[in-house]
């Protein structure tokens, strides 16, 4: 299996430039948000901008036609099959895709269409493990699993889920390795209590204390007052 480190960012391009400089050896893709481009010319321009900033590949969940336009210009593209959030209404919402044979065939066909369009890989999201493994074994491209099992070439999770940095539901296919949201809640209480203590000290004249003050010696202070008379 591939040992590949991929970070996918749908960020403003100047934000990515800073990230690229901080992680020069990491293979990075930058996503073109769905609907951002309305023509092949626009999607090529967006892809070129992303590569110019130092990205290794472009993520795009739009049509094979748009993707082919980019790959013809030698832009490495990663597509998306299975449960694609931007087009989830067509597959029944946020749920697994491919649990019956007709859906599984469509995932296979979608993967092949993207392969024919020239992608270097696809993100395969919420597809049954056996289906994902079969497609992986019968494809020439990199299959990146998002909840589609160990049989794919690489694994992908959102950092927010790995860190549990949000209070929302963690999906079944994800695994948390920390609980930053819990720690942040504690930190926010500490910050709140500190601000309340500061306000109380000011109101009761406990702050500032002598150790917080800057002093002038009596002789210099007298000179200061005399000079103003």
Give the positions of each predicted feature.
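Alpha/beta enzyme core
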Residues: 1-229
């Amino acid at each position: 299996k591939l040992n590949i480190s991929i970070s996918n960012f749908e960020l403003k391009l100047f934000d990515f430039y800073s990230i690229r400089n901080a992680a020069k050896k990491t293979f990075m893709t930058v996503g073109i948000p769905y609907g951002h481009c309305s023509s092949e010319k626009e999607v090529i321009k967006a892809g070129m901008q992303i590569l110019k900033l130092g990205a290794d590949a472009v993520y795009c969940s739009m049509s094979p036609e748009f993707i082919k336009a980019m790959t013809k210009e030698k832009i490495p593209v990663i597509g998306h099959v299975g449960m694609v959030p931007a087009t989830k209404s067509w597959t029944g919402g946020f749920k697994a895709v491919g649990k019956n044979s007709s859906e599984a065939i469509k995932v296979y066909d979608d993967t092949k269409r993207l392969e024919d369009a020239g992608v270097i890989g696809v993100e395969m999201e919420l597809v049954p493990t056996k289906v994902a493994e079969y497609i992986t074994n019968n494809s020439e491209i990199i299959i990146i699993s998002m909840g589609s099992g160990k049989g794919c070439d690489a694994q992908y999770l959102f950092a927010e889920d790995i860190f549990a940095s949000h209070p929302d539901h963690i999906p079944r296919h994800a695994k948390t390795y920390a609980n930053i949201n819990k720690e942040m809640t504690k930190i926010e209480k500490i910050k709140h209590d500190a601000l309340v203590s500061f306000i109380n000290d000011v109101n009761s004249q406990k702050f500032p204390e002598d150790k917080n003050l800057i002093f002038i010696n009596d002789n210099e202070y007298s000179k200061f007052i005399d000079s103003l008379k």
